[in-house]
Amino acid sequence: MQPLFDEDIRLPFVWNSSGYESVSTLEQYAELCDTALFDLRYANDSTAIAASAAPRYVAAARSAVKWAFERTPARHDTPPLIVRILVLPGHADEAIENLAWLATELSSEIPVSIMSQFTPAYKALETPPFNRKVTEEEYESVTEAAADFGFENGWIQGYEAADPALALLGENMPEGHGSIGGRNH
């Protein structure tokens, strides 16, 4: 990166994170980061352990998201923080709980990306409820909650993205389709 800085060439830098990392790790890259792209997958540590063997996930991920919200400066026209909410089968309530936490503890102005694309693989195929895709009802409960909490910035994948062949559907959402509040942001 130093040769780019020496030439005063500045490219947008996106920190793409599972959210399960320490704030001290994030601080090492704070000066480089233009946009922090964080996941909030679980709102319950027992789910995080069962699905990802990630003890203390909730505290770690929420601390990381809060740190990014408070510390990542806005540079360029990109938002400094985007939070991805992957709706998991049997755990839509946790996605809703994470949206509630974002709205009440940080801001409903944070852009969110609500995703339906969970596809069971490997050991998940043997582990209910992760052995199935998200139902349309589960997914709709989360998208409705996002609107209820006042989120208007971000993206909503079409439910059909739960089909692995269509997992990237929603990348270029047409006006009024898929974006929160009927607007693309």
Residue ranges of predicted features:
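Auxiliary Fe-S-binding modules of radical SAM enzymes
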Residues: 73-80, 85-185
